[in-house]
Amino acid sequence: MSRVYIYPLTVFYFFAIEMSVFCYYNWFYRRNFPYLFRPIFPFLIVLIS
């Protein structure tokens, strides 16, 4: 894997974790996030890692 592709992947991985943490914060503390979208970000992190 060349050095060119490592930086975009790490940035994308960081933003995926940021979005998942933000969405979990909404689900547990505000409870106003749509129920249908709850499994998307954990599956996204599992697919990336």
Swiss-Prot record:
List the GO terms this entry assigns under cellular component, sorted alphabetically: endoplasmic reticulum membrane
Transmembrane residues, as ranges? 6-28
Name where it mostly resides.
membrane
Keywords in alphabetical order: Membrane, Transmembrane, Transmembrane helix
Q: Indicate how the chain sits in the lipid bilayer.
A: Single-pass membrane protein
The listed locations are: Membrane
**UniProt keyword annotation of Transmembrane present:** yes
Name recorded for this polypeptide: Uncharacterized protein YBR196C-A
Q: Which organism is it from?
A: Saccharomyces cerevisiae (strain ATCC 204508 / S288c)
